[in-house]
Regions:
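PLP-dependent amino-acid enzyme catalytic core
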Residues: 1-283, 290
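Hydrophobic alpha-helical segments, chiefly the membrane-spanning helices
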Residues: 292-294
């Protein structure tokens, strides 16, 4: 079977689509954001049972590239990348443990914690960055004149981009707000030989600058408005279901942040539901002020 994904405008009245190899971050017709869309009709030609068996056979194995818990779901994530262009540190497969005492304190009978930060650079951003940098390598192999990949960051994104570009041998540029990045996060791009710019502004100022730089198609944008990263992060949902023996938790609570990871996890559960693999769950974003967003 030949699976394929593409960029699609999130505006239902527009619905324009673009190749994943197009250097594009917003719809050319209506200027809305884009998401990665999959050919679900083609994916449904395999039964839920067949998908489960395939993913079980790949999970945490050493066969390249499927030992990565992200690329082990390649057909549902980014089938457009040839295996030889995949840039991976065998991300995913993170620990899920039963937090009994914490659950008792919260009044929850069966409380589990998944440590998505157990990754090469110390954050879940690696799950998305493996997809983005692999796609860049794929585009370069097809003749795209990409000279570097760039991002604005307060730490985690820049560390992840630096690591994956170092693995791929692709130059990277990171824009960081001065004195607002931890030493642990700062040392990673510097150690990986990335052009690291410390700017006397906040994150929004860095983001404005990197967007201006990335107007040139030879510098590729790695920030979250590039929806390729969502595809890697949605595998958190796939992995949770697999770790729970193909059962869905009643509730999944995710740190809010900019809601990118919440969106990714929701997309993953929806995709598994559409394939007939799971039932629905309740997904909630939790902010530090204890405000819940359903």
């Amino acid at each position: 079977m030949k699976f394929k994904a593409s960029f699609k405008c999130i505006n239902p009245e527009c619905g324009s689509s673009y190749e994943l190899t197009d250097i594009i971050y917003r719809c050319r017709n209506c200027d809305e954001l884009l998401e990665v869309a999959h050919d679900m009709d083609e994916l449904k030609k395999r039964s839920a049972k067949e998908w489960k068996e395939l993913f079980e056979n790949r999970y945490r194995k050493n066969e390249w590239p499927y030992g990565s818990s992200v690329w082990g779901k390649k057909e549902l994530v980014c089938p457009n990348v040839n295996n030889e262009n995949i840039v991976s540190t065998y991300e995913g497969g993170t620990n899920l443990f039963w937090a009994d005492r914490l659950g008792q304190q919260l009044g929850l009978e069966d409380f589990w914690v998944k440590q998505c930060g157990m990754a090469h650079t110390g954050s879940f951003k690696d799950l998305g960055m493996t997809i983005l940098v692999s796609m860049v390598k794929q585009m370069m192999s097809q003749g795209k004149n990409i000279k570097a990949v760039a991002c604005a960051s307060t730490g985690d994104t820049s560390a992840s981009l630096a690591a994956y570009c170092a693995v791929a041998g692709i130059p990277a540029i990171v824009f960081l707000p001065k004195n607002k990045v931890s030493l642990t996060q700062l040392i990673q791009p510097i150690t990986h030989g990335v052009l690291t710019l410390s700017l006397d502004t906040d994150f929004d100022g860095c983001m404005k600058l990197v967007r201006e730089v990335c107007q040139n198609d030879d510098i590729y944008l790695a920030n979250s408005m590039n929806s390729l990263r969502i595809e890697g992060q949605k595998t958190i949902s796939f992995e949770l279901v697999q770790q729970f023996n193909w059962e869905v938790p009643d509730f999944v609570i995710v740190p809010g942040g900019n809601l990118g990871n919440v969106s990714a996890i929701g997309k993953g559960f929806q995709m598994f539901y559409d394939l007939g693999s799971v039932s629905y769950t309740h997904l909630r974003a939790h902010e530090t002020d204890s405000y819940l967003v359903s």
